[in-house]
Amino acid sequence: MSTLVKLSRTVLAALLFTLLLGPGTPAGAESFDVTNLVTDDQSVNAAPITDPNLTNAWGVSHSSGSPFWVSSNGGGVAVTYSVNPTTNVTSFGPVVVTIPGAGTVTGQTFNSAGSSAFNGDAFLFVSEDGTISGWRGALGTTAETLQVASNANVYKGTTLVMTGGHAYLLAANFRAGSIDVRKGDATAPDLAATFIDPNLPSGYAPFNVQVLGGKVYVTYALQDTLKHDDAPGAGHGFVSAFDAQGNFLGRVATQGTLNSPWGLAIAPASFGTDLAGDLLVGNFGDGTINVFSPDPASPKFLGQLQGGNGSPLDIDGLWALVPGNDGNGGNSSSIFFSAGPGGEMHGLFGVIAPVPEPATGLLLLSGITTGWLTLRRRRRSVT
């Protein structure tokens, strides 16, 4: 066999190796960037915007085109931010809303039922003092009380579910260990079941609840002795799925990498190379983001989002995970987050996006160049 044929095969092998590497990489090897957009203190977390109202940023929601609404648990308000879907340039939204009661607002949700439910309030909020409140434009800068505070209730998260033509607010009651249901109108019937995981170990309670992809997902965290806060730790957590009537569908995630899980989102179609439709579960306990199959009939752990250093991505005090809306609420291909870093003493709002991969053309050029240089060296050695 001639030397030239051998060298041609070397070039071909280099090209084939390049093609096998690109254009994508396995999800576990793909890296993601975190970009801070709003902070309460530049000396703690740098960001383009400083908002002193943002302390322990918690629940996040938006309508189909609205700015982001963010719960400030330590500030007693809900703040709003507009995010350009192309550039992520962020600006203050139109309103800051005072939350009634103690103001310890946690979860929130957009009222997609409109004027037919909850007095027509556009956004609904729950708080750690047991208050449930709502806001609509006519209320100005203060939300109204829909349910007064109670020591029996410590609400950590909330969502809206529509079933049978009626709206229901679901609230994760961490103290009582239940999903509390509030009807949107007086004619709404009771739900068929009560969102109970029959196999949940003692000491765990609902930490958050979200409607995603037609299912109701509930995260569970270990209660502290006062049943007010979570007791973080490796393996401290579960995620279960229910239908809209509260019937248990199955367990999605059991302990493992879970650590006081709270944030929940379905990965957008272009969020990473092969994560589309997977369930993202953010740990408040250690700030990492887990990936699971969303189907309770075939539960599967798929890994964790990776940072640029090859280690799991982690965000101190991570709370919400929410895709954008391609309007005033950022790009729908990105995941936006809230956090209470520094032991919930500070606030942070930002965006998570996959690191762009090298273009296929560049990879091919690299392979061709490698092969050509090899060919030149071999030819020189032959002559």
Residue ranges of model-derived segments:
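Sequence/structural signature of beta-propeller domains
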Residues: 28-354
